[in-house]
């Protein structure tokens, strides 16, 4: 089962209208190839507009009525570095009105991820050599 083009169009049109994002990225089961009848639709967005958590919840609920399935909306700018890297690596851009801004976000995220890996390399090395997190 794949997400239908009609459903994807509805999601894209609704989010562009409501969030005015410069980027929408589809991720999760719908792009990994195991989308099922009961799967939700995972979409990350990048927008200059700040969206409060409750408003995001209301948008997701309104989208359920539009497309007939749960929708999980993720504000890319609020996600953790690891999560952002996974979204970029495994996701599919379904809307971008500013490729330059998208490229800047991609580069910034990969730099943050590289720095994170650098910072935690010693910690992970210690865990690996001890064979335990707590040193026991």
Model-predicted segments: where are they?
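Short glycine/proline-enriched turns and hinge-like loops at secondary-structure junctions
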Residues: 36-39
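Catalytic core of pol beta-like nucleotidyltransferases
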Residues: 1-23, 31-33, 48-136
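Short hydrophobic/aromatic beta-strand micro-patches
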Residues: 44-46
């Amino acid at each position: 089962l794949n997400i239908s083009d009609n459903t994807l169009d509805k999601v894209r049109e609704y989010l562009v209208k409501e969030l005015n994002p410069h980027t929408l990225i589809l991720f999760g089961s719908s792009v990994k190839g195991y989308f099922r009848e009961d799967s939700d639709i995972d979409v990350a967005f990048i927008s200059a507009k700040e969206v409060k958590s409750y408003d995001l919840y209301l948008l997701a609920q309104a989208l359920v009525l539009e497309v007939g399935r749960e929708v999980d909306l993720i504000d890319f700018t609020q996600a953790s570095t690891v999560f952002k890297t996974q979204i970029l690596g495994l996701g599919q851009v379904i809307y971008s009105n500013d490729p330059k801004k998208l490229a800047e976000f991609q580069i910034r995220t990969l730099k943050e991820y590289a720095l994170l890996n650098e910072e935690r390399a010693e910690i992970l090395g210690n865990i690996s050599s001890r064979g335990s997190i707590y040193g026991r």
